[in-house]
A protein has these predicted regions:
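Conserved N-terminal beta-strand and adjoining loop/helix that marks the start
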Residues: 2-27
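Short secondary-structure boundary/capping segments
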Residues: 7, 29, 88-89, 107-109
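Short, well-ordered beta-strand micro-motif
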Residues: 17-19, 96-100, 120
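Short helix-loop capping/hinge motifs at secondary-structure junctions, enriched
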Residues: 23, 104-107
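Conserved Nudix-box catalytic region and its N-terminal flanking loop in Nudix hydrolases
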Residues: 23-66
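Nudix hydrolase/Nudix homology domain
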Residues: 34-37, 106-190
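Active-site segment of metal-dependent pyrophosphate-handling enzymes
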Residues: 64-105
Length: 190
């Protein structure tokens, strides 16, 4: 019966991890128990911040640690979806960060994943599949973000905004503060 169904909300965090190769940018996807491809991610532990959760889960699921990642501090994406598990309806919110790595070898946990692969963007979209539109959307956002960063000329960013007398960093609204130890994307000037 629908009335006996329990509703559960959960928040998880993870990473869209990429590396640059001679063939182009490749994205890491994990094969979840022979069912679908997705990013490394997992549940929060008590008192844990979302970035700390993403780092811990990525290390647990892939063997890729913080020391192997160059975290892109000005990117964060969200994915929302729901699914049924037993008599529960689960509503998931996924917080995804973006990070680059040079590490190729991944160590998966067999109880959670049955495989992994590094995919070029268009191949990643294909293996994710039509039913995972949120994952594909995040992958698109990450790919566009990376491509935009590659095209940016060296030197200070070109101002294209409504108030030409203000520096772009004074206009941009920060969506999140950097993790302790990370420099802000646009440091404040004295």
């Amino acid at each position: 019966m629908e009335s006996n169904r329990q509703i559960k909300k959960q928040v998880v965090a993870g990473f869209v991890i990429f590396r640059r190769t001679e063939d182009g940018v490749k994205y890491l996807l994990l094969y979840r128990r022979g069912q679908y491809w997705n990013f490394p991610k997992g549940h929060f532990e008590l008192g844990e911040a979302s970035l700390d959760t993403a780092l811990r889960e990525t290390k647990e699921e892939t063997g890729i640690g913080k020391e192997d990642l160059r975290i892109i501090s000005d990117f964060r994406a969200y994915e929302k979806f729901s699914f049924d598990r037993g008599n529960e309806r689960i509503f998931d919110t996924v917080i995804l960060y973006l990070a680059e790595t040079k590490k190729v070898q991944v160590t998966i946990v067999p109880r959670e994943h049955s495989g992994y692969a590094w995919f070029l963007y268009h191949d990643a979209l294909k293996v994710v599949g039509k039913q995972y539109a949120g994952t594909k959307r995040v992958l698109r956002l990450a790919n566009e973000f990376i491509k935009g960063k590659q095209r940016r000329p060296a030197g200070p960013p070109q101002a294209q905004h409504a108030h030409p007398t203000k520096h772009p960093s004074q206009q941009a609204e920060r969506r999140h503060e950097p993790h302790p130890g990370q420099r802000p994307a646009h440091p404040k000037r004295p």
